[in-house]
């Protein structure tokens, strides 16, 4: 409860993307989690969506299908585009993040890392797209002028994401991620 309240107090809006399955023990956990979320302050409800990762990946063709399915989910995309990111330059805030995704899973760091990586990838894609809205800002002009920068940022994003996910997996389970290459 305290953790959820802390996240909501810091980011104002929280969208829970629950990766728990829809059968066996994961269903019981998902229902308990939903009940827990309902008990929080109802004046600022937390949005919730169940995304049964394993069923989706089987139904739509593996990891690439999971990414495509997340892109198609209107409620996930609407929140992602609304929450955005914070962009500051020379002490001036151009964009302010207005929410956060809370990805919930049972015991599979791989599926959590894949879905969070897809959301992060989409946020970076949005960032590059939105640079045009701030074309008069020097930092945006500089970013847009350096044609090698997007490729370098994409590569850095992939490397950092994979390395961080692998490190977290090693800390919590003693083994690296099995899906680190994604």
How should these model regions be labeled?
Residues 14, 20-54:
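Carboxylate/His-rich catalytic cores and anion/metal-binding grooves
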Residues 25-34, 59-63, 113-118:
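A short acidic (Asp/Glu
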Residues 17, 49, 60, 114-115, ...:
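Intrinsically disordered, low-complexity regions enriched in proline, serine, glycine
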Residues 2-7, 182:
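Short, small-residue-biased leader/transition segments that mark boundaries at the very start
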Residues 61-99:
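Helix-loop module immediately N-terminal to the HCX5R catalytic loop
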Residues 12-21, 89-125:
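C-terminal, well-structured subdomains that either form a transmembrane helix-short loop-helix hairpin
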Residues 40-41, 77, 109, 113, ...:
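A generic secondary-structure signal for well-formed alpha-helical elements
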Residues 23, 35-39, 59-72, 96, ...:
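Long, compositionally biased intrinsically disordered terminal regions
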């Amino acid at each position: 409860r305290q953790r959820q309240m802390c996240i909501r107090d810091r980011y104002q809006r929280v969208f829970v993307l629950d990766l728990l399955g829809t059968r066996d023990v994961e269903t019981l956990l998902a229902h308990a989690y939903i009940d827990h979320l309902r008990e929080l302050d109802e004046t600022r409800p937390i949005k919730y969506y169940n995304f049964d990762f394993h069923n989706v990946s089987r139904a739509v063709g593996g990891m690439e299908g999971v990414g495509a399915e997340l892109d198609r989910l209107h409620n996930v995309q609407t929140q992602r585009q609304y929450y955005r990111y914070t962009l500051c330059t020379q002490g001036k805030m151009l964009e302010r993040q207005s929410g956060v995704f809370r990805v919930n899973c049972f015991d599979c760091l791989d599926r959590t890392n894949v879905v969070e990586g897809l959301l992060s990838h989409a946020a970076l894609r949005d960032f590059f797209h939105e640079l045009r809205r701030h074309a008069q800002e020097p930092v945006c002009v500089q970013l847009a002028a350096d044609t090698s920068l997007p490729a370098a940022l994409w590569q850095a994003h992939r490397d950092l994401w994979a390395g961080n996910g692998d490190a977290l997996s090693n800390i919590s389970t003693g083994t690296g991620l099995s899906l680190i290459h994604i």
